[in-house]
């Protein structure tokens, strides 16, 4: 049974909002159907009642199997596979932005109805499978007293954590199960208001840069443009000095980042704006161009002006880059990572995408992990369901967040409703050559192993100690999200 709100006026408003027509156009892929925008007092809002998995399990394709490798976590968000195969899990809930309008008061309880009731962990948990049999015997707290940790990356012997207010680091030795002290702050991150609090992160494999996604402070500038300073952007950060610069802008909420193997291209998944109807605007996957502008707040899906933004900026709209691949409207995509050959030929060339699921559609979407195939280095064709079964007509059993590919042949999925980490593997291993250089500059998840990784030069900090922003490499290198 769907969660009911007992306040009669609220219930009436929600019912009226849900009465509009909601045909589901195919607003996914490289050329989505956008349709006309719709305006109303409230969006359609349906959240299925959270329920225990019980004997149920997520559904995966034939030839694959799924298991729960960690349970009883405290809101797991993103994961990082370390060079020795250990997994770090970032646990936490952030953000406490004030509600601006009556609609925010209405939507708040409905959003909350589809989330876990446990207290935020504000910690990192380490998982270990000592004998490689797929059972993670060790589940222990690696570090606590963090502030809504989300993005994770590793460069050489340091683990980087993107809290909601700062980028911090821990020294690390292979096999270590607990941090040896409090983290060192690399740089503060924008945190005032924190309407979108998550700070996604990935590392270049040569260890020179971290990329951090910083979401907007509103849906569509309700707090004014001053509140959007250093928001809806991706920062490029020097991990040695903390110096940073804006790498790309106009991305409303970049919730996960990854680097494409081979090309070194930075990719992001982005949550788009609300309140233009159930079928606008699609969340998206895109290659991130240095200096690129992706539309927010002035336009969506390239150069389609948002009618609510006044005054408009025609030059900004004209410069907006059309994203590479639409993921559907309101899917709340929160995870992305490139696959590897060990995941099997059908799922070896492309990205896995974690969809947390909608709250503002009468016909729910998302609540699954999909695979987006690539051809010649670009997204191609329709998305393929890879992990489903997180909800049915009556109940929600889980909500996927981060997805991380273990290069040995496994997909790690964080479920922040059931507080479980799922692991999906082929039932029979695929015979593929192992990549050389495992355990190089960055670990898989928020910054992945690359055989060409190079240790950051000791001279980098001195060369940039004059306060200048770090110079961008011609082509950022690395893998993972």
Language-model features: where?
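C-terminal motif of bacterial Sec signal peptides marking the signal peptidase cleavage site
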Residues: 16-18
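Asp-box/WD-like beta-propeller blade repeats and closely related beta-sheet repeat scaffolds
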Residues: 138-155, 163-204
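Conserved beta-propeller blade signature
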Residues: 86-88, 158-161, 209-213, 265-269, ...
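Hydrophobic core register within WD40 beta-propeller blades
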Residues: 79, 152, 201, 254-257, ...
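Compositionally biased, proline/threonine/alanine/serine-rich low-complexity intrinsically disordered stretches
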Residues: 433-481
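Beta-propeller domain segments
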Residues: 21-60, 96-99, 113-114, 119, ...
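Structural WD40 beta-propeller signal
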Residues: 72, 82, 155, 204-206, ...
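Surface loop/turn motifs at the tips and blade-to-blade linkers of beta-strand repeat domains
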Residues: 70-72, 140-146, 186-193, 246-250, ...
């Amino acid at each position: 049974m769907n969660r009911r709100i007992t306040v009669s006026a609220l219930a009436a408003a929600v019912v009226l909002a849900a009465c509009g027509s909601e045909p589901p156009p195919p607003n996914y892929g490289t050329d989505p159907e956008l349709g006309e925008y719709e305006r109303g007092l409230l969006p359609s809002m349906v959240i299925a009642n959270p329920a225990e998995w019980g004997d149920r399990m997520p559904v995966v394709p034939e030839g694959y199997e799924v298991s729960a490798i960690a349970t009883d976590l405290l809101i797991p968000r993103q994961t990082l596979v370390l060079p020795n195969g250990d997994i770090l899990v970032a646990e936490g809930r952030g953000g406490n932005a004030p509600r601006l309008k009556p609609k925010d008061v209405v939507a708040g309880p409905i959003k909350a109805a589809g989330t876990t009731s446990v207290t935020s962990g504000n910690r990192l948990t380490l998982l270990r499978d000592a004998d490689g049999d797929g059972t993670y015997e060790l589940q222990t707290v690696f570090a606590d007293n963090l502030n809504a940790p989300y993005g994770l990356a590793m460069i050489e012997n340091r683990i980087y954590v993107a809290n909601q207010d700062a980028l911090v680091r821990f020294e690390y030795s292979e096999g270590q199960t607990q941090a040896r002290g409090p983290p060192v702050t690399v740089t503060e991150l924008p945190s005032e208001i924190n309407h979108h609090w998550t700070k996604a992160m990935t590392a270049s494999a040569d260890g020179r840069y971290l990329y951090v996604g910083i979401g907007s402070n509103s849906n569509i500038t309700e707090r004014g443009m001053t509140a959007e300073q250093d928001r809806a952007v991706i920062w490029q950060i020097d991990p040695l000095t903390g110096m940073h610069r804006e790498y790309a802008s106009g991305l409303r909420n970049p919730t996960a980042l990854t680097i494409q193997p081979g090309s070194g291209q930075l990719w992001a998944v982005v949550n788009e704006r609300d309140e233009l109807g159930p079928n606008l605007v699609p969340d998206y996957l895109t290659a991130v161009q240095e200096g690129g502008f992706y539309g927010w707040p002035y336009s969506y899906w390239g150069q389609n002006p948002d009618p609510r933004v006044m005054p408009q900026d025609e030059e900004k709209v004209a410069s907006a880059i059309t994203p590479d691949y639409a993921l559907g409207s309101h899917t709340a995509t929160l995870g992305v990572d490139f696959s590897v050959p060990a995941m099997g030929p059908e799922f070896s060339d492309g990205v896995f995408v974690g969809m947390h699921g909608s709250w503002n559609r009468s016909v729910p979407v998302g609540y699954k992990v999909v695979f987006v195939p690539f051809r010649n280095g670009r997204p191609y064709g329709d998305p393929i369901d890879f992990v489903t079964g997180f909800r049915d007509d009556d109940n929600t059993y889980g909500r996927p967040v981060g997805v991380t590919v273990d290069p040995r042949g496994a997909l790690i999925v964080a479920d922040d409703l059931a507080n479980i980490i799922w692991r999906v593997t082929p039932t029979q291993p695929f015979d593929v050559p192992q990549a050389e250089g495992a355990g190089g500059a960055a670990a898989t998840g928020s910054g992945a192993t690359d055989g060409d990784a190079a240790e950051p030069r000791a001279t980098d900090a001195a060369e940039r100690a004059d306060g200048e922003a770090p110079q961008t490499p011609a082509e950022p290198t690395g893998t993972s999200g």
